[in-house]
Amino acid sequence: PMNERLKRWPHLPLIEGNEIINPQVSAKDQELLTKQYTQRAVSFIERNRKKPFFVYRPHSMVHVPLFVSDDFKGKSGAGLFGDVMMEVDWSAGEIMRVLRKHNLHKNTLFVFTSDNGPWLNYGDHAGSAAPLREGKGTMFDGGCREPMLAWWPGTIPANSICREPAMTIDLLPTIAHLTKAKLPEHTIDGQNVW
């Protein structure tokens, strides 16, 4: 039975660049991923704070299977999913903290978003799209309509809400516009929404 499982779901390595740094990520390793991702992002910002930089920090959490570090286990009062959300929130806060520490926050666009709604086949421990209908894998609003937070003190007014529709594919042309970077020559589907 274990060999059949491995054929369908082989062990997942941890890769940095093109190098496998951990060939078989254990459950304990996954408990530490959010902290490790955060530490690496903070370290990158520290090292590159004197020049323009781009950090893309996608978390593997809150995708199932869910794992959380000991510092956040049982802390949210909302079960494992809540604990994982609390740790991801902490991670975003750490990145914002280092931006403030080096006075980079007024010259940095910080974006926090999701790629899809909750996995409904995992029950209530995978989140909720309420009040929207359905979740991941559907074309209903609960599956494809996601929140996005953008933080840029001095440029984006605090507590402002944009109700214009946009998609994550719009991030590349928008960021390129803001940074005066050249877009690829081939056609892309996104649009500058600034």
Residues covered by each model-derived region:
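Acidic, His- and aromatic-enriched active-site or binding-groove loops in soluble protein domains
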Residues: 1, 85-88, 130-136
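Short, solvent-exposed loop/turn and secondary-structure capping segments
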Residues: 1, 25, 65-72, 121-128, ...
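Formylglycine-dependent
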Residues: 1-53, 59-68
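Substrate-binding rim/cap in mid-to-C-terminal beta-strand-loop elements of soluble/periplasmic
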Residues: 12-22, 93-102, 121-122, 128-187, ...
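Solvent-exposed loop/turn segments at secondary-structure junctions
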Residues: 20, 29, 60-64, 90, ...
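A long, amphipathic alpha-helix that forms part
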Residues: 32, 36-45, 69-108, 125
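Loop/turn elements at helix/coil->beta-strand transitions in domains of secreted/extracellular proteins
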Residues: 49-55, 104-110, 145-146
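Short, solvent-exposed turn/loop segments enriched in Gly/Ser/Thr/Pro and often Arg
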Residues: 55-65, 112-120, 189-191
